[in-house]
Swiss-Prot record:
GO terms for cellular component: endoplasmic reticulum membrane; photoreceptor inner segment
Up-regulation conditions: Down-regulated in liver by fasting and rose by refeeding.
Keyword annotations of the record: Acetylation, Endoplasmic reticulum, Lipid metabolism, Membrane, NADP, Oxidoreductase, Signal-anchor, Transmembrane, Transmembrane helix
Protein name: Retinol dehydrogenase 11
Residues annotated as binding NADP(+): G45, A46, N47, T48, G49, I50, G51
Changes after translation: Not glycosylated.
């Protein structure tokens, strides 16, 4: 009888505790009052989710914001929504397919011809747990989009970021990087492939890239940070029915895209973070990085291998 009554009361208990759980899990809010008139920002994957909320906040602060999206139609819808909400007409959509180096190079070429400055590069876009597939250039999709695509984009825009200093680069990683390993003999999933692990490997690559990039940018006025946005309801789960089911089951513990954008915004806007360039953040504070994520030898080798795969000079 007691068990039956407890079961009946469970919805009421959840109703009472859910707000407290949500408040606890959404901790970490960007409280910066920095305004951005005259500043230029690029946010990849900004047509939806965390990227759209990040772009919206930057636009609210007066920045010229470029939504770099694979789906231009969805990007235009997002841009109109952001313009309507913020009153900022300087929100633009440009085609960027991170699974195609030709598209990345075309985006960068057009942007550099269009803009004199770039102050914020938010490498937000990504894929998660997709079936084994390859990019237009033959890279495994996770490492190709999440790491190599943003690696190339950053390379192509870096001189503009230096010219516009102080400027910042924010790379979205994940708590999942703790499960990641960089196996150079299986970087493309040639010998063994797991969609979940491939995602984790690529998120570890984001952290290693941030770490190595920060070393190379020391004294340039450009700083870089990696972030874990939290567990966020987004379109990243579109390839996994299991993940979509888990997201629905544990909805209480899932952040909204706006909440998920807070750490990206914190790293992009908070004054005084320059000395922490190369660091990893979660919930708007420094976060623990896995052992391999702190390995400078692996970071340097991944840099060299990435340059080789993309046909880039090693010293940039």
């Amino acid at each position: 009888m007691f068990g039956f009554l407890l079961l009946l009361s469970l919805p009421f208990i959840l109703y009472l505790v859910t707000p407290k759980i949500r408040k606890m899990l959404s901790s970490g809010v960007c409280t910066s009052n920095v305004q951005l008139p005259g500043k230029v920002a690029i946010v990849t994957g900004a047509n939806t989710g965390i990227g759209k909320e990040t772009a919206k906040d930057l636009a609210q602060r007066g920045a010229r914001v470029y939504l770099a999206c694979r789906d231009v139609d969805k990007g235009e819808l997002a841009a109109r929504e952001i313009q309507a909400v913020t009153g900022n007409s300087q929100v633009f959509v440009r085609k960027l397919d991170l699974a195609d180096t030709k598209s990345i190079r075309a985006f960068a070429k057009d942007f550099l011809a269009e803009e004199k400055h770039l102050h914020l590069l938010i490498n937000n876009a990504g894929v998660m747990m997709c079936p084994y597939s390859k990019t237009a250039d033959g890279f495994e999709m996770h490492i190709g989009v999440n790491h190599l695509g943003h690696f190339l984009l950053t390379h192509l825009l870096l001189e503009k970021l230096k010219e516009s200093a102080p400027s910042r680069i924010v790379n979205l990683s994940s708590l999942g990087h703790h499960l990641g390993r960089i196996h150079f003999h299986n970087l493309q999933g040639e010998k063994f492939y797991s969609a979940g692990l491939a995602y984790c490997h690529s998120k570890l690559a984001n952290i290693l890239f941030t770490k190595e990039l920060a070393k190379r940018l020391k004294g340039s006025g450009v700083t870089t940070y990696s972030v874990h946005p939290g567990t966020v309801h987004s379109e990243l789960t579109r390839y996994s029915s299991i993940m979509r089911w888990l997201w629905q089951l544990f909805f209480v513990f899932i952040k909204t895209p706006q909440e998920g954008a807070q750490t990206s915004l914190y790293c992009a806007l908070t004054e005084g973070l320059e000395s922490l360039s190369g660091s990893h953040f979660s919930d708007c504070q420094l976060a623990w990085v896995s052992y391999q994520g702190r390995n400078e030898i692996i970071a340097r080798r991944l840099w060299d291998v990435s340059c080789d795969l993309l046909g880039l000079p090693v010293d940039w």
